[in-house]
From Swiss-Prot:
Pfam name, any one: S-AdoMet_synt_C
Region described as Flexible loop: spans on this chain: 101-111
CDD domains in the cross-refs: S-AdoMet_synt
Family annotation (PROSITE patterns): ADOMET_SYNTHASE_1, ADOMET_SYNTHASE_2
Top-level enzyme category: transferase
Name of this protein: S-adenosylmethionine synthase
Presence of the UniProt keyword Cytoplasm in the record: yes
TM ranges: none
Main subcellular location: cytoplasm
Complex formation: Homotetramer; dimer of dimers.
Classification via Gene3D superfamilies: 3.30.300.10
Binding site for ATP: H16, D168, A169, K170, R234, F235, D243, R249, K250, A266, K270
């Protein structure tokens, strides 16, 4: 009997307070890497009513204006008036509390130091990569459309077409699966911060017509699709005034929307020596190439590291019964075609560049921007040939 179920994923806008924090942390990371590609960065941001705090550990030769970067990032998102929006990059108090990277950690990461003379992992941990055939970019459908809805919302807000819209927003997409294949969108939830002078009917009509129907293909929608637009009825107070925001609190939004697994490590504000970020990007690259090669319809890879050690503790591939080869054989292909040591990951994906602010909203995966090397499928042909397909 065909398996019939619903699966939902959410996204948030660039104006959501947690995403604001992610973007500030990654804007700082980019500025540091632009001057000193070997910067060691662990930058955490918190935003709340009237202020922004930047903390963490940074070792760098770069000299940057942390406050200026934070203010510019906040204003670019759209928080430009404390009077009308409750928050502004121009008037928020910016606190900076930074230290250097621990020398104990550094000796395990610096090449030629510590017990393993190769560049070791910046921490222990488990990282996952995932890909599937549900969309052209090999991402799960629910998170893919949840992100696209938020991108469209921001586009129309900034152009003035949604004149009432303000930066804070969230989306959620529920997809029906039959035999593990997506067949329809059953529900869409969008909550958008708005000006106090617009009525709910206008918000509902414009979100459905200008955002949802512009993004989700008509063949996926049907008469029974449910739309929940600002279901509380009012969303005037938003952004950092409505909720405090902190770097690294949207890790499922950042990845696969709850489909597949997550090792728990956040991305934003971390330089590529942190395997939380670089190995998760590599995992996406590996999984996407396996699926692009036709070795499986769905693929998840887990990689584990120990701090200061270059070689992974373990590598595991799961194709959920969709593989053309058994999972053990695909795991061996991965070990043959991909070097999973931290320094090799940085080199293969060219990660010592100021490319991270773009990743900090609307998903780190599934957007085929030129800078996002982990979205390339340049290993697919070699994998397919080696598999004998």
């Amino acid at each position: 009997m065909p398996r019939n179920y619903l699966f939902s994923s959410e996204s948030v806008s660039e104006g959501h307070p947690d995403k604001m924090a992610d973007q500030i942390s990654d804007a700082i990371l980019d500025a540091l890497l632009a001057q000193d590609p070997l910067s060691r960065v662990a930058c955490e941001t918190m935003v709340s009513t009237g202020f922004c705090t930047i903390a963490g550990e940074i070792t760098t030769k770069a000299v940057i204006d942390y406050q200026k970067i934070a203010r510019e990032t906040i204003n670019a998102i759209g928080y430009t008036s404390a009077d009308t929006m409750g928050y502004s990059g121009d008037t928020a108090a910016i606190f900076v509390a930074l230290d250097k990277q621990s020398v104990d950690i550094a000796q395990g990461v610096n090449e030629g130091e510590g017990i393993d003379l190769d560049q070791g992992a910046g921490d222990q941990g488990i990282m996952f990569g995932y890909a599937c055939t549900e969309t052209d970019v090999l991402m799960p459908m629910p998170i893919y459309y949840a992100h696209r809805l938020m991108e469209k919302h921001a586009e129309l807000r900034k152009s003035g077409e949604l004149a009432w819209a303000r930066p804070d927003a969230k989306s959620q997409v529920t997809v029906r699966y039959v035999d593990d294949k997506p067949v329809s969108v059953e529900a869409v939830v969008i909550s958008s911060q708005h000006s106090p002078d617009v009525d709910h009917d206008t918000i509902e009509k414009e979100i459905i017509e200008k955002v949802i129907r512009a993004v989700i293909p008509a063949e996926l929608l049907h008469e029974g699709t449910q739309y929940f637009i600002n279901p509380t009825g009012r969303f005037v107070i938003g952004g950092p005034v409505g909720d405090a925001g902190v770097t690294g609190r949207k890790i499922i939004v950042d990845t696969y929307g709850g489909m597949g697994s997550h090792g728990g490590g956040a991305f934003s504000g971390k330089d590529p020596s942190k395997v939380d970020r670089s190995s998760a990007y590599m995992g996406r690259y590996v999984a996407k190439n396996i699926v692009a090669a036709g070795l499986a319809e769905k693929c998840e890879i887990q990689v584990a590291y120990a701090i200061g050690v270059s070689q992974p503790m373990s590598v595991m591939v799961d194709t959920f019964g969709t593989g053309k080869l058994d999972d053990e054989a695909i795991t061996e292909l991965v070990k043959k075609h991909f070097d999973l040591r931290p320094k090799a990951i940085v080199q293969q994906l060219d990660l010592l560049r100021p490319i991270y602010k773009k990743s900090a909203a609307y998903g780190h995966f599934g957007r085929e921007l030129p800078e996002f090397t982990w979205e390339r499928t340049d290993k697919a042909a070699a994998l397919r040939a080696d598999a004998g397909l």
